[in-house]
Amino acid sequence: MGHHRPWLHASVLWAGVASLLLPPAMTQQLRGDGLGFRNRNNSTGVAGLSEEASAELRHHLHSPRDHPDENKDVSTENGHHFWSHPDREKEDEDVSKEYGHLLPGHRSQDHKVGDEGVSGEEVFAEHGGQARGHRGHGSEDTEDSAEHRHHLPSHRSHSHQDEDEDEVVSSEHHHHILRHGHRGHDGEDDEGEEEEEEEEEEEEASTEYGHQAHRHRGHGSEEDEDVSDGHHHHGPSHRHQGHEEDDDDDDDDDDDDDDDDVSIEYRHQAHRHQGHGIEEDEDVSDGHHHRDPSHRHRSHEEDDNDDDDVSTEYGHQAHRHQDHRKEEVEAVSGEHHHHVPDHRHQGHRDEEEDEDVSTERWHQGPQHVHHGLVDEEEEEEEITVQFGHYVASHQPRGHKSDEEDFQDEYKTEVPHHHHHRVPREEDEEVSAELGHQAPSHRQSHQDEETGHGQRGSIKEMSHHPPGHTVVKDRSHLRKDDSEEEKEKEEDPGSHEEDDESSEQGEKGTHHGSRDQEDEEDEEEGHGLSLNQEEEEEEDKEEEEEEEDEERREERAEVGAPLSPDHSEEEEEEEEGLEEDEPRFTIIPNPLDRREEAGGASSEEESGEDTGPQDAQEYGNYQPGSLCGYCSFCNRCTECESCHCDEENMGEHCDQCQHCQFCYLCPLVCETVCAPGSYVDYFSSSLYQALADMLETPEP
């Protein structure tokens, strides 16, 4: 490595000069402009470094798709054969100390190589104007931290922009990014290969900038051991390091998806692929168990520390793919115990990121969704237990140990997040086991069910996760309760609440039935009241008819008296009508009703005066006779006991209510309307005649 030092220092100095020459306004413009352009400066040698650095600042390293093999050679050209040189660990420690403290307030520790310390400051100035706000390294990082906070907060990834800057970054970040030490390349590669190498290095930086979205096979056990030390102290700085040889192969595959790589860059390694060793994950677990806000970045023995650091830091690794072993899962479980609520990587959630990271970041439940199906049965069993306690979190875990760790952690840290996003397979299995309804969901929604009958159950099930079948009937809920008897020991309160809710629902139904009965009773009472009203109306009509007949009688009496011949004819007619009487309905005597309604009190007061003789005397009128409507004639006996004058009868004769008609008693009741009198027969015959006239047209 020693013969490459002049190259490194020269490139660093040139990059610093280029960054100083550019004014701040240019850097601000570059923030808006420079995304998405490719670096097409294929110059070679040290002489063109300044031009390349300036072009680097204009064209940020995103999507260099056209040069598939450039990164490989640049990494080896600049002499960063990390896998072939024995001095690599020392430089790793130096650079890790130099650049490992990128957060504001993190003091960069001592640098064994002074030139590298200077290069860190210069490169930071160079990187200051980039659109992503990817911070450089060194002491100036804390000064411009406010400038770059609106860019990826706490993701102070080390940008690698141009070929020259790639060379500079190869020295600065050769422990963060260009760790793809391709063993087959020597530091003495031809300069003719530099063009391809540099642009591919930029491409590699873009994918490495991508927080190792696709972390592939082949991380060794030694790398993992070093990761343990590296991750103990990595904070939100999240160094985005490179990978081994396979990463370059992936870069070739991902040339067409560079923009996707950039989105995946901040996607926090949604897809971490196969082949991570057991020790790597154990070390990662140690690293993440000790994450403090202080994030003191200590020296790293190997570049692999940073590599695993990024993979696990941005890990939350929503989809860590197959062949991860149980120890890896346990280790990363420790990582997420302390890190899940803290890593909210804002501003870089593409649609793909939402799909990949949604289960990871916002639901914080299954960080290990796509593990091998080896432990799928255990996973299902644990899921049933977890759904019994806190189904809202929906934590389909891959392994028992991981699940146990998550239980305590999520009970405390993420109590209020209802994580409904569960993989489809697990959804089906869990829905079958839990009887289509999780108990904890019932607890949360049974209060709504109270007093609403079956509507409460429907509202309740509307909040269930997609794997759970909506239950619409209370009878179905009871079936579910029979299926969930296995979980009564773990969650007895939910079943008790189910019983209470069912009882309350039954009470609601009983109340509904009672209400119906009350309504029916009211209807019946209303029917009775209608009958009474009808009777009252009939009485009123009869009273009106009586008044009309009385007026007619008076007019008849005042008019010409009838001849005896005419009276005889009327009697004959009446006899003939009496024969036909069965055809007619006999009109009840209105005197009886009058006696019942208004004359009861007066009769009682009159005592012996109103005896049965009077009833017989005034009750034997002919049917239909007007005298039958002379209700006052029944009160004539009361007039004897009434000592009031005619002038003031209404005022003083309170007991004699009908005394105002007492003067009519000797004139009408005793003479005209006596039973069997002329008026009695005449009026009855007239009534019958009218009845015949009305009845005959109908047939």
From Swiss-Prot:
Residues recorded as bearing Phosphothreonine in the entry: T76
Positions of Sequence repeats: 106-121, 134-154, 155-177, 180-213, 214-237, 238-270, 271-294, 295-318, 319-342, 343-365
Residue numbers of Phosphoserine PTMs: S119, S145, S333, S358, S431, S494, S567
UniProt superkingdom: Eukaryota
Keywords: Calcium, Phosphoprotein, Repeat, Sarcoplasmic reticulum, Signal
Biased composition, class Acidic residues, residue ranges: 187-206, 244-263, 302-311, 532-551, 567-581
Region (4 X tandem repeats, acidic): 106-365
Chain residue ranges for the region called 6 X approximate tandem repeats: 106-342
GO CC, one annotated term: sarcoplasmic reticulum lumen
Subcellular location: Sarcoplasmic reticulum lumen
Pfam families: Hist_rich_Ca-bd
Region described as Metal-binding: spans on this chain: 627-673
Residue stretches of biased makeup (Basic residues): 148-158, 173-183, 231-241, 288-298, 336-347
Compositionally biased region (Basic and acidic residues): 55-89, 324-335, 444-463, 470-481, 504-515
Function in brief: May play a role in the regulation of calcium sequestration or release in the SR of skeletal and cardiac muscle.
Family: Belongs to the HRC family.
Protein name per the record: Sarcoplasmic reticulum histidine-rich calcium-binding protein
Gene symbol of the encoding locus: HRC
